[in-house]
């Protein structure tokens, strides 16, 4: 499909620079396969779900993966986006034209890294010497890696260390938040439990590649980025049992959805999974694992807008986004959300 079919105009005032407070007061657009759109708030979610429905959350934790440093006299910026091993990370490096293999970058706070290898996609392998885990070094020297559409409009601050982390965050490794889950609060979780809604968690370490633009003119020519994820056997078994009992599995966020679909065969059985996934979902895809999706509003011509269009239909999603824009919904990572139930 032509990528420009997934384009739309978004006024800059619709881009959220801070999250709603409290988190579950954000707006929620209810979208079915047909019929009118429903203007709700996230706190309404328990009334929209049935007892026995299962919400699936991503428990990855965002690390402060953005570093600013010096290579000699030159300033260098790095965004770590994929762990290679205990001391090596793959990173997008800014101002890297003169960076050479073996160069040492001083990131401050006693943190240094050696540029080991330039990779075919233009990123670099960085080696962090010493005994401390790299995650500890990042807590000392790094900043939260806010998406470019936020970071380009205001500086990152300490508040983002809290705001850009979900209540489920448990496993270090993401460089972008699974943003649909940012809307959940302990009180909302209590209300969902009282409604009889079940919850499960999986782990997908969201990479910076999630923000890379689609440069191809046709979707079939786009190379999707890979991200590491895992679903354990017990979780897979419970999800399969819920579906066998006629209950709905609803992914909270596109990261949860992509990992669930990666772990599910043509027989619609969810299996344990551990490894990289580069699944790219576009219209025409047959969903095997999920019955619905809660997700924020995505960028024009992005792989994630293609994903929601695959779930609900392109015309339906273009209409939903037009409704959201006209209604003043807030877009992107810190913005409002939608509940898509085909």
From Swiss-Prot:
Principal subcellular localization: cytoplasm
Superkingdom of this protein's organism: Bacteria
Keywords assigned: Cytoplasm, Queuosine biosynthesis, S-adenosyl-L-methionine, Transferase
Record's subcellular location: Cytoplasm
Documented EC number(s): 2.4.99.17
GO cellular component terms listed in the entry, alphabetical order: cytoplasm
Enzymatic reactions: 7-aminomethyl-7-carbaguanosine(34) in tRNA + S-adenosyl-L-methionine = epoxyqueuosine(34) in tRNA + adenine + L-methionine + 2 H(+)
MF (Gene Ontology): S-adenosylmethionine:tRNA ribosyltransferase-isomerase activity
Pathway the protein takes part in: tRNA modification; tRNA-queuosine biosynthesis
GO BP: any one term: queuosine biosynthetic process
Keyword Cytoplasm: yes
Matches recorded under InterPro entries: QueA (IPR003699), QueA_dom1 (IPR042118), QueA_dom2 (IPR042119), QueA_sf (IPR036100)
SUPFAM superfamilies: QueA-like
Segments crossing the lipid bilayer: none
Assembly and interaction partners: Monomer.
Its job: Transfers and isomerizes the ribose moiety from AdoMet to the 7-aminomethyl group of 7-deazaguanine (preQ1-tRNA) to give epoxyqueuosine (oQ-tRNA).
Family per similarity comment: Belongs to the QueA family.
Protein name: S-adenosylmethionine:tRNA ribosyltransferase-isomerase
Lineage summary: Bacteria, Pseudomonadati, Pseudomonadota, Alphaproteobacteria, Sphingomonadales
Gene: queA
